[in-house]
Amino acid sequence: MMQELKILNEKRAEIYWWLSSLFFKELSEQDIARYHSAEVRTFLSGLADEQSLSREVKHLVEALNRLQDRQDAQLELAADFCDLFLKSDRDSALPYASVYTDQGLLNGKPAQQMRELLSAHGVKVEQNLNEPEDHLAIQLDFLAHLAISANQIEHSAQLSLALQAQSDFISQHLLTWLPAFAERCTQFDAFGLYSAAARLALAFIQQDKHCLDELIQETH
């Protein structure tokens, strides 16, 4: 079981790092070209094999297909990113937990909690990401770190605690605000790529928590 779990954790970390990259910064021309490659389309097809993710993967693929016909695709998609995630007006979907859970304030209690968690686990945020620590990209990256770090554990009791920590992080730091974030993305993202990504992130996180909770029961 341990070897199977290590493979699963590597796959989970890969998906979390990928999701983090979508909300980290605007996609470049090279990034967009990669999304049209057979390698990435195979990766997305693999995700779609999971029934709970298939609908949201389909919406993301449809948006990527529309992107191929979009005039000035990179510039327009960068504008979508800016309008959704970098503006502070009412027609945006700011990717910070504090906005949704701390009276709409930036850099609130969730950011402080994330700073403490990152410090406790020795995780450093990329220097060029000048954002509060409760940014979605940072939270997803941290979850990937937790998943891959669990592979260093050999004892089942410690492993169960590590899996529980991941489940608790999802409950306490992501599911408290991600549904509202995904809803706002859907409301304000006319083209639909980032709203599809947000809904897919939510669906994957919900499914991952369910999977973690089952694994915790098995390791007891």
UniProtKB/Swiss-Prot annotation:
<dbReference type="GO" id="GO:0005737">
    <property type="term" value="C:cytoplasm"/>
</dbReference>
<dbReference type="InterPro" id="IPR050289">
    <property type="entry name" value="TorD/DmsD_chaperones"/>
</dbReference>
<dbReference type="Pfam" id="PF02613">
    <property type="entry name" value="Nitrate_red_del"/>
</dbReference>
<comment type="function">
    <text>Involved in the biogenesis of TorA. Acts on TorA before the insertion of the molybdenum cofactor and, as a result, probably favors a conformation of the apoenzyme that is competent for acquiring the cofactor.</text>
</comment>
<dbReference type="InterPro" id="IPR036386">
    <property type="entry name" value="HscB_C_sf"/>
</dbReference>
<dbReference type="InterPro" id="IPR020945">
    <property type="entry name" value="DMSO/NO3_reduct_chaperone"/>
</dbReference>
<protein>
    <recommendedName>
        <fullName>Chaperone protein TorD</fullName>
    </recommendedName>
</protein>
<dbReference type="InterPro" id="IPR023069">
    <property type="entry name" value="Chaperone_TorD"/>
</dbReference>
<comment type="similarity">
    <text>Belongs to the TorD/DmsD family. TorD subfamily.</text>
</comment>
<keyword id="KW-0963">Cytoplasm</keyword>
<keyword id="KW-0143">Chaperone</keyword>
<dbReference type="GO" id="GO:0006457">
    <property type="term" value="P:protein folding"/>
</dbReference>
<dbReference type="GO" id="GO:0051259">
    <property type="term" value="P:protein complex oligomerization"/>
</dbReference>
<dbReference type="InterPro" id="IPR036411">
    <property type="entry name" value="TorD-like_sf"/>
</dbReference>
